[in-house]
């Protein structure tokens, strides 16, 4: 069964968790197993979220970094926290081999650009 693991950076500000909850709820409309985890500061950690997916029966996991670009967190921290070494994209769980695929960061997308335009306009209209 496919599991989707959303990765958020995390912050000392607790509202980060609200973002994770809302994206997980949204994706749950399309996928049965969705969890989110943080790279730092907030809970659940990325490792805890992975464990939750595995406990629910995920045998293939697509990791979706909610990051805009490739950087240290993407290249080093996410694989390390998931227990992936080098090019190997599999982990062992209860005697089973679990495939983990890490999606690319969000990058540029016109739909995200539209959300930014909307935010600018709403902010401007509230203040003027």
From Swiss-Prot:
This is Sirohydrochlorin cobaltochelatase. The active site is at 9 (proton acceptor). Co(2+) binds at residues 9, 73. The keyword Metal-binding applies. Belongs to the CbiX family. CbiXS subfamily. It holds the Pfam family CbiX. Its EC number is 4.99.1.3. The gene is cbiX. InterPro entries: CbiX-like (IPR002762), SiroHydchlorin_Cochelatase (IPR023652), Sirohydro_Cobaltochel/CbiX (IPR050963). GO terms for molecular function: cobalt ion binding; sirohydrochlorin cobaltochelatase activity. Homotetramer; dimer of dimers. Disulfide bonds: none annotated. GO terms for biological process: anaerobic cobalamin biosynthetic process. Catalyzes the insertion of Co(2+) into sirohydrochlorin as part of the anaerobic pathway to cobalamin biosynthesis. It is an enzyme of class 4 (lyase). It catalyses: Co-sirohydrochlorin + 2 H(+) = sirohydrochlorin + Co(2+). Substrate binds at residues 43, 68-73. Keywords: Cobalamin biosynthesis, Cobalt, Lyase, Metal-binding. Pathway: Cofactor biosynthesis; adenosylcobalamin biosynthesis; cob(II)yrinate a,c-diamide from sirohydrochlorin (anaerobic route): step 1/10.
